[in-house]
């Protein structure tokens, strides 16, 4: 009998377990349809834990755990607000929990190296990238393009001039090149002057060279002035325009009044009208009898006589003018010439011969 009673009890417990499992499964399946029943059941289990332990203890199972309250408001009252749980969400949470557990187990199984630990510590707090750092990196490593490649090629080749950016107050490359050419030309001319000026090779610097060249040119100018003065003193140039005017006046008076013609000794060849013209290239030869020195004087006649070409009239007598010796004696009014031509013209016999004195006109 006792054995029969024990078998009945075990069968009764199994039947209770089956009924409880079926009820729980039905509640989980129909949680969306019958939310109030689910809340009531779990609320009762939470309120009377002893009752739940007694029920599950009598059935030989463990009591279910209390569900987590939403937003940390898990109260012990039966009327506590629980979040709605869908079966899909429950399955997804269970899957995620399993995955997390597996991942943790794998991490625990894998050995960690010290380098990996340091990298993990460094990656724990990522630093924020500064806004200017990216631009600097782009400028430091520009993209490959034909323009950049050309610039790198030109940068590799050294230029003769200094590269200057075209900014305000600064020159461009073309301007600097023109300036370099201009300075080269100036240096070449300075070399030529340095070769011409004696003693300029010893001077260093363009300023000193220019001072030396200026001093040399000034000394040359002074030498030229001194030489010109010396030449003028050795070869005096006499202007006989006054003498020509005097002769022209006397000849005009003689043409008007032949009796007033002074005693002038003229050769026959000079009586012709062509010989009486006062041309600048006419040459006259006279001699100083007393001194005996030959004096060569250059007569510069720039103007023709006021009366133009003059001729001696046919009625004028020139026979008294001839000298016995065959030479022509000139009656020169020296007193009237040096007294301002105020005194009357007085004829003075002179023994000057034409062969000894040369007068270039």
From Swiss-Prot:
Q: Which domain of life is it from?
A: Eukaryota
Q: Which GO terms describe its biological process?
A: gibberellic acid mediated signaling pathway; positive regulation of gibberellin biosynthetic process; regulation of unidimensional cell growth
Q: Where is the composition biased (Polar residues)?
A: 146-157
Place the motif Nuclear localization signal on the sequence. 166-173
A GO cellular component annotation in the UniProt record: nucleus
Q: Where in the cell is it found?
A: Nucleus
**Taking the first listed entry, what is the main subcellular location of this protein, grouped into a coarse class?**
nucleus
Q: Looking at the record, which segments are called Basic motif? A: 170-183
Q: Where is this region: Helix-loop-helix motif?
A: 184-220
Recorded hits in SMART domains, A to Z, give: HLH (SM00353)
Q: Does the record's keyword annotation contain Cytoplasm?
A: no
- GO MF: DNA-binding transcription factor activity; protein dimerization activity
- Biased-composition ranges, Basic and acidic residues, are 124-138
Which keywords appear in this protein's UniProt record, sorted alphabetically?
Gibberellin signaling pathway, Nucleus, Transcription, Transcription regulation
Residue intervals of the bHLH domain: 170-220
Region span, Disordered: 66-159
Kindly indicate whether the keyword Transcription regulation belongs to this entry.
yes
This chain's function reads: Together with BCL1, positive regulator of cell elongation at least partially through increased gibberellic acid (GA) biosynthesis.
Relate the assembly described in the record.
Homodimer. Interacts with IBH1.
Question: Could you say which protein family the record assigns here?
Answer: Belongs to the bHLH protein family.
Q: What is this protein called?
A: Basic helix-loop-helix protein 79
Q: Which species?
A: Oryza sativa subsp. indica (Rice)
Lineage of origin:
Eukaryota, Viridiplantae, Streptophyta, Embryophyta, Tracheophyta
């Amino acid at each position: 009998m006792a054995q029969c009673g024990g078998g009945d009890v075990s069968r009764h417990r199994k039947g209770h377990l089956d009924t409880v499992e079926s009820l729980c499964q039905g509640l989980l399946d129909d949680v969306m349809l019958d939310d109030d029943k689910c809340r009531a059941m779990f609320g009762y289990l939470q309120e009377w834990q002893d009752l739940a332990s007694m029920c599950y203890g009598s059935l030989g199972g463990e009591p279910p755990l209390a569900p987590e309250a939403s937003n940390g408001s898990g109260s012990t009252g039966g009327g506590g607000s629980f979040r709605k749980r869908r079966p899909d969400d429950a399955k997804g949470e269970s899957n995620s929990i399993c995955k997390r557990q597996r991942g943790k187990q794998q991490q625990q199984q894998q050995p960690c190296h010290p380098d990996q630990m340091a990298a993990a510590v460094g990656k724990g707090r990522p630093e924020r990238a500064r806004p200017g750092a990216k631009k600097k990196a782009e400028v430091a490593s520009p993209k490959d393009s034909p323009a950049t490649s050309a610039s790198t090629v030109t940068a590799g080749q050294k230029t003769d001039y200094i590269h200057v950016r075209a900014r305000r107050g600064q020159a461009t490359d073309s301007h600097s090149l023109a300036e370099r050419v201009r300075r080269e030309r100036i240096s070449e001319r300075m070399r030529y002057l340095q070769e011409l000026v004696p003693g300029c090779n010893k001077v260093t610097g363009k300023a000193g060279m220019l001072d030396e060249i200026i001093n040399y040119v000034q000394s040359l100018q002074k030498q030229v002035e001194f030489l010109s003065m010396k030449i003028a003193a050795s070869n005096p140039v006499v202007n006989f325009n006054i003498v020509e005017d005097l002769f022209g006046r006397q000849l005009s008076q003689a043409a008007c009044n032949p009796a007033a013609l002074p005693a002038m000794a003229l050769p026959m060849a000079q009586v012709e009208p062509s010989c009486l013209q006062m041309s600048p290239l006419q040459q006259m030869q006279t001699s100083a009898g007393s001194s005996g020195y030959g004096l060569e004087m250059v007569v510069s006649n720039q103007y023709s006589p006021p009366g133009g070409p003059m001729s001696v009239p046919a009625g004028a007598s020139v026979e008294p003018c001839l000298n016995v010796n065959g030479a022509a004696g000139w009656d020169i009014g020296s007193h009237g010439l040096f007294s301002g031509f105020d005194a009357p013209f007085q004829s003075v016999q002179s023994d000057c011969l034409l062969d000894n004195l040369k007068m270039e006109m």
